[in-house]
Amino acid sequence: MENTLREFQMHELEMLKALSDKLESAGIRFYLIGGSSIGALRHQGFIPWDDDVDVAIMRRDFKRAEEMLCQLKAPFLYDPVEKHVIPDAPLGHIYLNDGRPLEEAPRIDVFAIDNVPDSSLCEKFQNLCSMIYHVCVLRRPAENRGKFKKLFTSAICNLCPKFLLDFLQKLAYKGVTAWQNKSTKYVSNIYGVSGKNEKVPAEFYGVPRYVAFEDVLMPIPEKAEEYNTHIYGDYMKYPPEEQRVPSHFGKVVK
């Protein structure tokens, strides 16, 4: 068991290298996003207090990527989106499966990036489908998504029997991903923590750009500076000291 956050991060770095090897062997692009992208640009590695890794894959490649990640060898374990071992959001996770509770294990969050339709009406339809898909995958109301979304998803969860949730899940998935093979101006990490701010010009992701991350080169969005500024503002500025804390590492060392 780790005694320091740095040891925790080093486990995640090994997991990231394994992910990179799997995806690149299949010709699948991925990007470090979120705090991992900031870490790459500001620290050339992990943000010193960060305790997970955020990775994004374009929706058109996502199912194939999940198939590859399910082949990771022990002690690494991939938890697919629709398996939802830990029901937090419809995204995939890679864990260090070493016997501890998975909620406390080193992990990589794996997000799908969806094309956003250019039509505002179609975008609203996609947003509706994303809410329905969320509750159908997790089988519980959406958290931290606003009062309306919580009420709406609570109604679906409480009123629909399992067979109907299964049907709605497949239908909603088709609605969310209907534009995956089309060229659109914008893309979004729909289930990212920044909500509507996750919608960015498609060119921000572009062709992955490799930069130093600890002792390896890892891909970030082509226009990572613009991407991070759009979502986080002045991302090169350190947050207040009281905010420089890990999300769940403390559970491990207590």
Predicted regions and their residues:
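Solvent-exposed, non-transmembrane amphipathic alpha-helical segments
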Residues: 43, 50, 57, 130, ...
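Short, cationic low-complexity segments
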Residues: 128-144
